[in-house]
Curated annotation (Swiss-Prot):
Any Pfam family hit: Lactamase_B_2
Family: Belongs to the UPF0173 family.
Top-level taxon: Bacteria
Lineage start: Bacteria, Bacillati, Actinomycetota, Rubrobacteria, Rubrobacterales
Keyword Hydrolase attributed: yes
Coiled coil: none
Protein name: UPF0173 metal-dependent hydrolase Rxyl_1261
Presence of keyword Transport: no
Keywords per UniProt: Hydrolase
NCBIfam families assigned: PRK00685.1
A molecular function GO annotation: hydrolase activity
Transmembrane region(s): none
Length: 242
């Protein structure tokens, strides 16, 4: 069932909110690269290897910390909002593609659409100062097989998640459940309901003490809502579609 849905795509969880998506044709897409200082990322996976695209939902360190070094190392194109794109260009990264909410761009063999997210966004520069990072967003990534994955980024639940479901029909949602600075498991269950998805990977929990939400709480709230969900609790380093 899951293999059929993925259509040859592989999804590797690298910890926190970082995922590598590998297309059937071998293209590699990294979402929210937080690797070197990520306590959840297995040491052997902190070097990403070949990479084509980097998607950045917002500028906070736990989503953006390794975007520039990885882009330098691999030559991957960084896709992010205008402010983050401008910043990475100022740091010498030539391959940068601005994308904003509601816009869709073809990047290699996939289509990437920017979606709304309710959070904050700032960039901590190398000298320790903080600059404006534009507005946060999520992404819907559509593969040539028709498989669609929604990475919500950091966000609260919001009513227009229903619209994301209606317009794009994601098959799989990667949803934060950590609470306090992102959705709680309770809100994440309602996000799954609004999106109308059947498959969810919980993310952005347990990395730091202020992210106490758990997959068990998420599963309980989903069950109380009567949702028929397949919840894929992935350990860092695990892969869907292998």
């Amino acid at each position: 069932m899951v293999q059929e849905m993925l259509g040859g795509t592989r999804i590797t969880y690298l910890g926190h909110a970082t995922f590598r998506l590998t297309t059937p044709g071998g293209e590699n897409i990294l979402i929210d690269p937080f690797l070197a200082d990520n306590p959840q990322t297995p040491e052997e996976l902190k070097q990403v290897g070949d990479l084509d695209t980097i998607l950045v939902t917002h500028g906070h360190f736990d989503h953006f910390a390794d975007a520039i070094p990885v882009a330098r190392q691999t030559g991957a194109t960084v896709v992010a909002n205008f402010e983050i794109s401008s910043y990475v260009q100022s740091q010498g990264i030539e391959n940068s593609m601005p994308l904003n909410k509601g816009g869709t761009a073809r990047v290699g063999g996939v289509k990437v659409t920017g979606t709304n997210a309710f959070h904050a966004s700032s960039i901590q520069t190398e000298d320790g100062s903080t600059i404006y990072g534009g507005e946060p967003m999520g992404f819907v990534v559509e593969f040539e097989s028709g498989f669609k994955v929604y990475h919500a980024g950091d966000t609260a639940v919001f009513g227009d998640m229903r619209l994301i479901g209606e317009l794009y029909g994601p098959d799989l949602a990667l949803l934060p459940i950590g609470d306090r600075v992102v959705m709680s498991p309770f809100e994440a269950a309602h996000a799954a309901r609004l999106l109308g998805v059947r498959h969810v990977v919980p993310m952005h929990y347990g990395t730091f003490p202020f992210l106490p939400g758990t997959p068990e709480e998420f599963e309980r709230h989903a069950r109380e809502l009567g949702l028929e969900l397949e919840i894929h609790v992935m350990k860092p380093g695990e892969e869907l579609g292998s």
